[in-house]
Amino acid sequence: SAERVKSELKKVIIGQDDVIEQVLIAIFTRNHALLVGVPGLAKTLLISSLAESLDLEYKRIQFTPDLMPSDITGTEVIYSDPSTNERQFKFLPGPIFSNIILADEINRTPPKTQAAMLESMQERKVSIGGEDHSLPDPFFVLATQNPIEQEGTYPLPEAQLDRFMFMIKVDYPNEEE
């Protein structure tokens, strides 16, 4: 139940009650969410703890300036069948083939790589070498983003922001928390 998950998360995350509530709404409505906040506010811990409490497969993708689309979606490799010695392509799935994806610092990678991730979010599949590969169900992307004014960021275009149903602002806990 949502209350059980919320209480599990509150054991790990101090404060951030509104953030926990909004993330749970995103998950239970089967939508993606973008968490915006400076580093060090437990965004990553929240998402990994959420996956654990829901018993879903979880992968973290650290978005960096040199990350390539195939690092996310997977790639085809040439495979030699030992019995026939015939060469063929074999698909190796990338980390996006998981139930909950933490797209960490999504605005630190160039637009081409962002687009590969965001297309998968929209279509819930990956197209490689002319073949479609369905993503698991359920499939959620919870992305983190540093504020745009920070150096070394690539702002997400409006069309890509539309892939996220929720933009959740993560701030420092107040004194009481």
For each of these PLM feature ranges, what is it?
Residues 1-41:
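Pre-Walker A (pre-P-loop) alpha-helix and adjacent loop at the N terminus of AAA/AAA+ ATPase modules
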Residues 22-25, 80-102:
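Conserved alpha-helical scaffold flanking the Walker A/P-loop in AAA+ ATPase domains
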Residues 24-65:
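Walker A/P-loop
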Residues 33, 101, 139:
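Conserved beta-strand position immediately N-terminal to the Walker
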Residues 38, 72, 144:
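P-loop (Walker A) phosphate-binding loop of NTP-binding proteins
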Residues 68-84:
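Conserved NTP-binding/hydrolysis module of P-loop NTPases
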Residues 79-84, 109-113, 121-177:
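Canonical AAA+ ATPase core
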Residues 104-105, 116:
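Walker B catalytic acidic pair
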